[in-house]
Regions:
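Aromatic-residue-lined binding/catalytic grooves and analogous aromatic/hydrophobic interfacial grooves
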Residues: 375, 413, 506
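Structured secondary-structure scaffolds
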Residues: 2-49, 101-105, 156-372, 415-419
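Short, charged/polar, low-complexity loop and linker segments
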Residues: 339-344, 397-405
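Basic, alpha-helical terminal appendages of large translation-related enzymes
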Residues: 1-6, 46, 122-127, 131, ...
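Short helix-to-loop capping/linker segments positioned immediately adjacent to catalytic or ligand/cofactor-binding
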Residues: 182-185, 402-415, 464
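Conserved, charged catalytic cores of large soluble enzymes
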Residues: 2-14, 19, 31-205, 240-252, ...
Length: 531
């Protein structure tokens, strides 16, 4: 895998026709966990999120709500930013496609592609879905000319002169690129979807609209506005500009390009895995090494939708259960890349079992014993002398490699399972080793080793879980006597040597421990409202 010294990654720029839904929260939580993992490695990291704000759908939505398009965008953007704060998302840049600096980047990029001969005026005829902002093939339509994705909406017939991008010119180049970079599209199931789409033959696509006012004018023909995707994808580039820099492509691409990872939902895969690399090839720019399309979420086994009235409000969910709970459930319970389900009963069970019982109780029990047997200090012993086959050391020494590989592969569920295995082994070991009996026998050396190895295992689990549950990991670390905040990566790197903390055996003997307090309250299902 191509390893640059800096790591920029993106969520999609979310469409602002409506307030954020659970799917947007899911992608953003995953991106935030990946960004925190990279920062934990000491790698300069830039997490980009933002909003895609142009197009006919926004124009019509705003009109219905009796707002100006920009007022509408501003209100929805506030909703996204508030949710990201609530979910403890540490984004570095929030890219809005209505930003004036973005227009300058789009104009320069357009002119570069135009100079290459890749833009021409042509006639666009076809069935157009306003909700998708895209033309549909007749063979894909449902009965009564309805869109296969927005099945409650009829498509509209369009016949207009538009500007086109010569996607067909990049057919061979794209196929070669996919063959030489098999990891570009992940997971493999998504890669296969893209390859079969491309093999059917690429058609040039329209990049402008004639009767849409809400968008940037086409630089060479102000009568037309640029189509939402040509504008939106470039929002990733604009986001790379330093706040004070003049908005030129050279400035935007100077430090962070190529972006190392685009995280997206599989519904926008084609734009990121086909249109976007072709646009970049046309502009002679290096391509990002990885696009990862995750799966869809269902609720209680059913597709979520407003029409079905079973949507899951991410704000309400997070306010009720807390950010760590929501982050943990979605990253642990769903194999990243596959479709996954949310069920509230399961949600409560998983969090209580893993975080309140396995992790929380283990820390609490062990700290209480350390208070009783070791005056609330880390037991004193020779750490290096602990036998390599000690059940906790044996797992603990493998954690770093297993977990970092899993994070690099976006296998968040595997990260959680590996660390849970360490914690569950800790619980079993504590029961079997029975330090209370050893203490009564006066065997203080045995007590020291038992408590040290359990506390160290909890510490190591907290360290590696911190990208997923940063607040919980901070609480654990503070109870173990560190003044560490996993929410502040700058201060974190100044407080601890990260390269010591990522391995087993770092807890310092005789370090003062805090008073044991429960780190994760047991969750309860909301009681059904009395009729």
């Amino acid at each position: 895998m191509h390893h640059s010294s800096v790591f920029a990654l993106t969520t999609p720029l979310y469409y602002v026709n409506d307030l954020p839904h659970i799917g947007s929260a899911y992608t953003t939580i995953a991106a935030d966990a990946m960004a925190r993992f990279q920062r934990l490695q000491g790698r300069p990291t830039l997490l980009i999120t933002g909003t895609d704000e142009h197009g006919q759908k926004i124009e019509r939505t705003a009109e219905k709500l009796d707002r100006s398009p920009l007022d509408h965008c501003n209100q929805v953007v506030q909703g996204f930013q508030d949710l990201w704060t609530l979910l403890n998302i540490q984004y570095d840049r929030f890219s809005r496609t209505t930003d004036a600096r973005h227009e300058a980047i789009v104009r320069e990029f357009y002119q570069r592609v135009e100079a290459k001969g890749d833009i021409y005026l042509g006639q666009q005829q076809g069935w157009y879905c306003v909700a998708c902002e895209e033309f549909k093939e007749e063979r894909d339509l449902l009965s009564e000319k309805r869109c296969p994705i927005h099945s409650n909406q009829a498509v509209e017939w369009r016949d207009e002169r538009n500007y086109f991008f010569r996607l067909s010119r990049y057919q061979d180049q794209l196929e070669t690129f996919y063959a030489e970079h098999p990891d570009f599209i992940q997971p493999a199931s998504r890669r296969n979807e893209v390859l079969s789409f491309v093999r059917r033959g690429l058609q040039d696509f329209s990049i402008s609209r004639i009767n849409v006012r809400w968008g940037f004018p086409v630089p060479s023909d102000p009568e037309q506005t640029l189509y939402v995707w040509f504008d939106a994808l470039l929002g990733y580039v604009t986001a790379l500009l330093e706040p004070e820099a003049e908005p030129t492509l050279a400035n935007a691409l100077k430090h962070w390009w190529p972006i190392q990872l685009h995280l997206i939902g599989k519904d926008i895969l084609r734009f990121h895995a086909v249109y976007w690399p072709a646009m970049l090839m046309s502009a002679d720019l290096p391509l990002p090494p990885r696009v990862f399309g995750h799966g869809f979420l269902t609720k209680d086994g059913q597709k979520m939708g407003k029409s079905l009235g079973n949507t899951l409000d991410p704000v309400g969910l997070t306010q009720q259960y807390g950010a760590d709970a929501v982050r943990y459930y979605f990253l642990k319970e769903i194999e990243f890349g596959r479709d996954g389900d949310f069920n509230e009963t399961r949600f409560v069970q998983v969090l209580n079992a893993d975080l309140a019982n396995d992790l929380g109780n283990l820390l609490n029990r062990t700290l209480s014993m350390a208070k009783k047997y070791c005056q609330s200090r880390v037991p004193t012993l020779e750490v290096a002398a602990i036998a390599p086959e000690h059940p906790l050391k044996a797992i603990g020494t493998t954690v770093k490699d297993r977990v970092s590989t899993a994070y690099e592969n976006l296998a968040f569920s595997q990260v959680c399972h590996t660390l849970l295995e360490l914690v569950q082994t800790g619980n079993r070991y504590l029961d079997q080793a029975a330090p209370w009996t050893r203490y009564k026998e006066g065997n203080t050396e045995a007590v020291a080793e038992i408590l040290y190895t359990v506390l160290e295992s909890v510490r190591l689990a907290a360290y590696w879980l911190s990208p997923i549950v940063p607040a919980l990991s901070t609480q654990i670390y503070q109870q173990l006597g560190y003044s560490v905040d996993f929410g502040d990566s700058v201060k974190l790197q100044a407080t601890v040597v990260l390269s010591d903390h990522d391995r087993w055996g770092t807890l310092r003997p005789d370090q003062a421990l805090a008073n044991p307090t429960p780190i994760f309250r047991t969750l309860e299902l909301p009681s059904a409202d009395p009729e």
